[in-house]
Amino acid sequence: MDTNTQKYMDTRAENKNTILFATLSQIFGDKMNLARIKFFGLFICALCKVQTVCFEKLAASFDSEVEVGSSLRRIQRFMAEYLLDTDLIARFVFALLPHKPPYRLALDRTNWKFGTTDINILVLAIVYQGLAIPILYTMMPKFGNSSTAERIDLMQRYIELFGIDTIDCLLADREFVGDHWLAYLNYKRIRYHIRIRENFWIDIPKNGHRVKASWFFSHLKLNQYEFHHGIVYVNGQLCYLSASKVKNKEGVPELQIIASFNKPDEAHSLYKERWQIESAFHKKRPL
């Protein structure tokens, strides 16, 4: 590698660090002193380098002239004594996003065991170029599905922090249905593409008939996709339906039926992006 190329690469690295520290100062300036902000920046850079939460490896990767043992003690003190404001973390992540809003959001829940403790987290993530970037979360003191109130609280936190205009649409799986939840999204006019079960009862406004969701799409063959042109009631809320026939994890063909606020013709391609949040969960689970 020639000298000019090396200088250019170093300059780019310096610029990235400058942007990082400037953003940290802007977001955390009222909550942290300068020394702690610099430490936090080193900590984030080390996390990106080693991609592990092992304190010893992180301390050894600090871009600093301080001894590893000293860096390790700083990490331990920081983790033990400092309570991070998750809203500030969300603002920090949001400020570093490489493109401008509106964003596609994915809502999902992940759970696992840490020793004998059940971990159950409701997560809202921004989907970007094949990645799901967690932006807000709620630790749920229970095992099982989230409630409508917990989902609404999480969405309201996002809206209060970043504004409803930064939302392109919301993607979610079959767990995230319910009349009050859909009513909230419709009232806020938040575009959504949410999967529903095949056996959901659907009410057709123009003739008053009630049918199963699968009735609209029973003719589909494997890998075919179709959307229903008319508006319908799902759980008492007006929305549009679309579906594709896919193979599930066991290789059995099934209907993937999606309820949408509008533009059901886009639901199939957009819903695929929801899988990024499940991939993110898989990578972040403890070994």
Kindly give the residue locations of the regions a language model identified.
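Single, function-defining residue in the core of a domain
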Residues: 2-52, 64, 89, 100-103, ...
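Short acidic/histidine-centered micro-motifs embedded in hydrophobic/aromatic stretches
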Residues: 61, 78, 287
